[in-house]
Amino acid sequence: MLSTKRKALDTGLQRRVRARREASEEIEESSSDSAPSETGKNDAEGGSSSDEEVDDDDDEELSESEEEASNGAASISFGALAKAQATMSKPSKRDSKNLKKSNGDGWEDNEATERKAGKKDQRDFTRSSKNAPTEVSSKKAVSRRREVVPVKKREIRDPRFEPTNGPVDMQKIEKNYDFLVDYREDEMKKLKETIRKTKDEDEKEKLKRELLRMESRKKTDARKRKAREVLDKHRKEEKELVKEGKTPYYLKKAEQKKRVLLDTFGELKGRQLDRVIERRRKKVEGKEKKNMPRARRMVD
């Protein structure tokens, strides 16, 4: 069946086609050949009749082949046609996308897809020159999420130190958590023992830094405790004076530091006091040199 169809198409393609002669050429030939011979006329008539017969035969063969092909196509079942259509290669997604881009405007297609997906506009709006204004697309997707009432971010809080519970009493807190000081002391002792037994230098340096951090924290806590004690002592004295009818005197920050230093180093004598004063002098001098401009620092 398929062979008959292919044969019909081949015969149709191989059919001889005669070119038509224009009227001007016929007139010129007739004028040039004023007296043709009878034999020439007979030959021409015979040739034209033979050509017409060949054309008629070709037309009959083509019509017969077309009828055979239509009959063969009618006899094919729908299942076979469906299978043939399924086996045909379908265009891939990439080819269809490229076809869309080539047919339509890529700029508008990108905008539509980005607007549909709710994404940011990824196009590069470059300026023609540095003096030209920057071009920005106004076709951006609007978020469906709306904040009618702004909700504050939930912060991590400790209910023990909330203002609703009243002012924080540091003395009471220190008294309640006084057992932590003993824990820290035991931990420092164990850390010192571990440093002494450790052979690895890197691990030893790490443990030493941890011990130094704990010792500095201990000194800071002791200094703060001393400052609170000095301030509490001054407040008690002022309360007694207020009972006697005198006006209260509130210490400034600088005065508080001065009293803490006097109370801390007032008991020291001789070389201990000189050593502490020299250490504090170097500390203050280092801070001043650090804050000094580089040019003046080099001159000094």
UniProtKB/Swiss-Prot annotation:
Residues 112-127, 144-161, 285-300 have a biased composition (Basic and acidic residues). Component of the 90S pre-ribosome involved in the maturation of rRNAs. Required for early cleavages of the pre-RNAs in the 40S ribosomal subunit maturation pathway. Associates with 90S and pre-40S pre-ribosomal particles. It is found in: Nucleus, Nucleolus. Keywords: Coiled coil, Nucleus, Ribonucleoprotein, Ribosome biogenesis, rRNA processing. The gene is rrp36. Residues 181-244 form a coiled coil. Residues 1-169, 280-300 are annotated as: Disordered. Its main location: nucleus. Belongs to the RRP36 family. It comes from the Eukaryota. This is rRNA biogenesis protein rrp36. InterPro entries: RRP36. One of its GO terms (cellular component) is 90S preribosome. It comes from Botryotinia fuckeliana (strain B05.10). The lineage of its organism: Eukaryota, Fungi, Dikarya, Ascomycota, Pezizomycotina. Signal peptide: none annotated. Residues 50-69 have a biased composition (Acidic residues). GO terms for biological process: maturation of SSU-rRNA from tricistronic rRNA transcript (SSU-rRNA, 5.8S rRNA, LSU-rRNA). PANTHER family: RIBOSOMAL RNA PROCESSING PROTEIN 36 HOMOLOG (PTHR21738:SF0).
